[in-house]
């Protein structure tokens, strides 16, 4: 998976987040030789594998859906590498690779028209087939998207608003392409972290809003950013036929920069989330595969995930990744609609029962009044 250099796993032990100074941050993008050498082996890397640039037509080999359902290419990250026997405890060491560049994007930077229908269904192959100039330009713009995402995450951690002027400073030499770069950065923020960038006031200030709510209304954790990670996990389980091995789950999480036993400044400690918090919350089921030696574990959807019609949310997530609509997954879409219909019908039945009970109560009261008279 192509890493995006410089996006850190921030230290969340500090209770008072420090202010993000743009000048300091920009200076940090041009490290000394010593700093570059340290950064090459550092473990502070975020993988934006859900970028179209990182999609692979071979993805279905690992996360293929049910046999009757063809998974559109580019829906999920390429996981054709060998699966580890246990979840890695930290990111891989070694020099950083170029950002978002393992495969060419189904979105062509050179055309700057995401609405172009000619791009849909087109197999773009690999970046090796591009002219050097176009490949270099794609690399540079992908890099600017990665830098902007990094800066936005730092602003989010510091609980600070961000201005358009600050964002323009990040892409200063490519400000003519700022609308496209910002649009891609927004997509990453929402898909990977469940954070939407909302403009408020006349001064072009932007604040962050959590967009993924999975819990019951009124619950304290409704709309928390870690819910976006849960959507990713549920999506993998869904695509794998409602059951995914622990190894596959961690392979995906490692690809987005989330590692077992390592605190993530947005998601927190992931192993605890997966095996305790979400299991106790009945969003996930974590069980040992019978007769496995050594013990082998797998994840399934928990009862609460089913009851809250999350299939629909998962389909919406997958559709966004593939720049399509949920109905592009016919059998899954049908299942999701069935869940929604059953939930609506249950609500109607409950309301009908309440109406009947109220009518019976009124009849009894009327009878009592008549008898008293």
Swiss-Prot record:
Localization: Cytoplasm; Nucleus
Cytoplasm as UniProt keyword: yes
Region named Interaction with TRIM28: 135-373
Keyword set, alphabetical order: Cytoplasm, Nucleus, Tumor antigen, Ubl conjugation pathway
Matching InterPro entries: MAGE, MAGE_WH1, MAGE_WH2, MHD_dom
Region (Disordered): 1-102
Tissues expressed in: Not expressed in normal tissues, except in germ cells in the seminiferous tubules and in Purkinje cells of the cerebellum. Expressed in various tumors, including melanoma, lymphoma, as well as pancreatic cancer, mammary gland cancer, non-small cell lung cancer and liver cancer. In hepatocellular carcinoma, there is an inverse correlation between tumor differentiation and protein expression, i.e. the lower the differentiation, the higher percentage of expression.
Domain MAGE span(s) in chain numbering: 141-336
Tree of life domain: Eukaryota
GO MF terms held by the record: ubiquitin protein ligase binding
Pfam family, one: MAGE
Biased composition (Pro residues): 85-94
Start-end of Low complexity biased regions: 40-60
A Gene Ontology BP annotation from the UniProt entry: protein catabolic process
GO cellular component, one term: cytosol
Coiled-coil region(s): none
Main location: cytoplasm
Role this protein plays: Proposed to enhance ubiquitin ligase activity of RING-type zinc finger-containing E3 ubiquitin-protein ligases. In vitro enhances ubiquitin ligase activity of TRIM28 and stimulates p53/TP53 ubiquitination in presence of Ubl-conjugating enzyme UBE2H leading to p53/TP53 degradation. Proposed to act through recruitment and/or stabilization of the Ubl-conjugating enzymes (E2) at the E3:substrate complex.
Alphabetized PANTHER family for the sequence: MELANOMA-ASSOCIATED ANTIGEN C2, MELANOMA-ASSOCIATED ANTIGEN MAGE ANTIGEN
Subunit structure: Interacts with TRIM28 and UBE2H.
Protein name as catalogued: Melanoma-associated antigen C2
Native organism: Homo sapiens (Human)
């Amino acid at each position: 998976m192509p890493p995006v250099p410089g996006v850190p796993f921030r230290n969340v032990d500090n209770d008072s987040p420090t202010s993000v100074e743009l000048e300091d941050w920009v200076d940090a993008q041009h490290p000394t030789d010593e700093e570059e050498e340290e950064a090459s082996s550092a473990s502070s890397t975020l993988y934006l594998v859900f970028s179209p640039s990182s999609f692979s037509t071979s993805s279905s080999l690992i996360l293929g859906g049910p046999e009757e359902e063809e998974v559109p290419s580019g829906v999920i990250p390429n996981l054709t590498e060998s699966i580890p026997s246990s979840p890695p405890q930290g990111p891989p060491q070694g020099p950083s690779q170029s950002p978002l560049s393992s495969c060419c994007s189904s979105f062509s930077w050179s055309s700057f028209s995401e609405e172009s229908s000619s791009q849909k269904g087109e197999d773009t192959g690999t970046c090796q087939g591009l002219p050097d100039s176009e490949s270099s330009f794609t690399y540079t713009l992908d890099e600017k998207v990665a830098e902007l995402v990094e800066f936005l995450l730092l602003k989010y951690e510091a609980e600070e608003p961000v201005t358009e002027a600050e964002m323009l400073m990040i892409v200063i030499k490519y400000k003519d392409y700022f609308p496209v770069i910002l649009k891609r950065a927004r997509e990453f923020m929402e898909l990977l972290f469940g954070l939407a960038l909302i403009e408020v006031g006349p001064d072009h200030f932007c604040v962050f809003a959590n967009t993924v709510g999975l819990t019951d209304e009124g619950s304290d954790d409704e709309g928390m950013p870690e819910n976006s990670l849960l959507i990713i996990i549920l999506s993998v389980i869904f695509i794998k036929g409602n059951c995914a091995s622990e190894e596959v789950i961690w392979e995906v999480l490692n690809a987005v920069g989330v590692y077992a036993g390592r605190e993530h400044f947005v998601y927190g400690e992931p192993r605890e989330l997966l095996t305790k918090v979400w299991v106790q919350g009945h969003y996930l089921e974590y069980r040992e595969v019978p007769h496995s030696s050594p013990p082998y574990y797998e994840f399934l959807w928990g009862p609460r995930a089913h009851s809250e019609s999350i299939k629909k949310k998962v389909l919406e997530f997958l559709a966004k990744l593939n720049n399509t609509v949920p109905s592009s997954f016919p059998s899954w879409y049908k299942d999701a609609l069935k869940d929604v219909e059953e939930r609506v019908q249950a609500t109607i039945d409950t309301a009908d029962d309440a109406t009947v009970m109220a009518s019976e109560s009124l009849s009894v009261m009327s009878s009592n009044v008549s008898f008293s008279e």
